[in-house]
Every structure is written in structure tokens, then in C-alpha cells.
Amino acid sequence: MEKLTLSFITLTVLSAIFTAASAADATPSQVVLDIAGHPVQSNVQYYIIPAKIGTGGGLIPSNRNLSTQDLCLNLDIVQSSSPFVSGLPVTFSPLNTKVKHVQLSASLNLEFDSTVWLCPDSKVWRIDHSVQLRKSFVSIGGQKGKGNSWFQIQEDGDAYKLMYCPISSIVACINVSLEIDDHGVRRLVLSTDQSFVVKFQKAYDSNSNCNLKSNSRMFLFL
């Protein structure tokens, strides 16, 4: 009886060890990594940059109607055409507030993190459905926790892609893609067949090389 009890305890301990080891092995594959190979941290500044070098720079806000004098009207998220511009840093706020690292396919909010902001709208990303243009733009002015502000990060080859994934909705996740408009502006829009493949670079310096300027549609180097 004593040997049987000892064997049971031994099996239980070994099972626990193997389970912990399996969980440890599985964790790295579930965590989003930055370009240095480190886990992307929640609520820490990162630049979202194209995965392919030489295909433009980082992400910044820009108003949709370039002919308007209201620089804060319909602020969409666009990609800088210059590969030397990192854009504005972004923070990721997961639905699960207890996690320290951003997980693959986990619901999260994105928000520009800039001390310089001239517009009254929030910096939280959201989806703006334009009935007139028949397009869905990735814009700012969202609200954390709201249905049109939920996104996910999913793998795309050796890089990642952003997905719009509303919670409590029959709508499946939709790719965030790039579309070049008639003015050559690279806007983030939703797409069923294309994706914007990106990587994440930790923002070590709070002074981005993309500065706010009111005389250039709010941001330089569109």
C-alpha cells in the first residue's frame, strides 16, 4: 500500500512537471515579439512599422478630406511614405488587464501615445464605417472597451498583421490593410483579402522623429 501511494505521488509530481514544461514551451509561441525578439509588453510604447524594409514608414493620423481647413476632422490612421519616419508610438491595452505581454489573437485596444496632441478626439483607435465612401477606415477617436475599438494581432509569415475583431458580434475578424488614395496617402482600411504586414519596434526615445506641425496637415512626411 505504501509503495502504491509513493508511486501515485511520484506520477503526480512528474505530471505536474511535464505540464509546467509544456506550458512554458507553449508560451513563447503565443506571445507577440518585437524586432529584437523580445515579448511586446502591454501599455508600453512601440512603433508599428512595415515588415518589409523600404516600403514606407510608421503610422500617424491624417484627416480624410485634404481640402478641409479643420485638421481634426475625420482623423484616419495612415502610413508615412518615408521609411525614415517611425510615426507615433502606440500602446496596446489587452482585454485581460492582468497580462504583461501582448498575446497572439487576444483582444486589445490600440492608442497613440503622444504628449503633443492638438485635437479634442481621443487617441484610441477605432473603425469608422463610411456609408458614402463604402469603406471602413481605421481612425482615432475611439473608446477603450467599445465594440469598434477591439483589435487583435495575428501571425503573418515571420511577421504580424492587425485584425479588427469586434467582441460580442457575429462579424468575424477582418484584416487591416493599406489603400493608397487619389492623393497618394496610404490609409489603413479594412479588407477581406489583403493585409498590412507589420513588425513592432520598442520606442526607447520619447522624442519621435515625426513631430506635430499644424502647417503640414498635423504631421510631417505623409
Swiss-Prot record:
PANTHER family: KUNITZ TRYPSIN INHIBITOR 1-RELATED (PTHR33107:SF13), KUNITZ TRYPSIN INHIBITOR 2 (PTHR33107). It comes from Arabidopsis thaliana (Mouse-ear cress). This is Kunitz trypsin inhibitor 3. The keyword NADP does not apply. SMART domains: STI. The keyword Signal applies. Keywords: Disulfide bond, Glycoprotein, Protease inhibitor, Serine protease inhibitor, Signal. Disulfide bonds join C72-C119, C165-C173. Induction: Induced by infestation with spider mites. Gene3D superfamilies: 2.80.10.50. One of its GO terms (molecular function) is serine-type endopeptidase inhibitor activity. Exhibits Kunitz trypsin protease inhibitor activity. Glycans are attached at N65, N175. Residues 1-23 form the signal peptide. Belongs to the protease inhibitor I3 (leguminous Kunitz-type inhibitor) family.
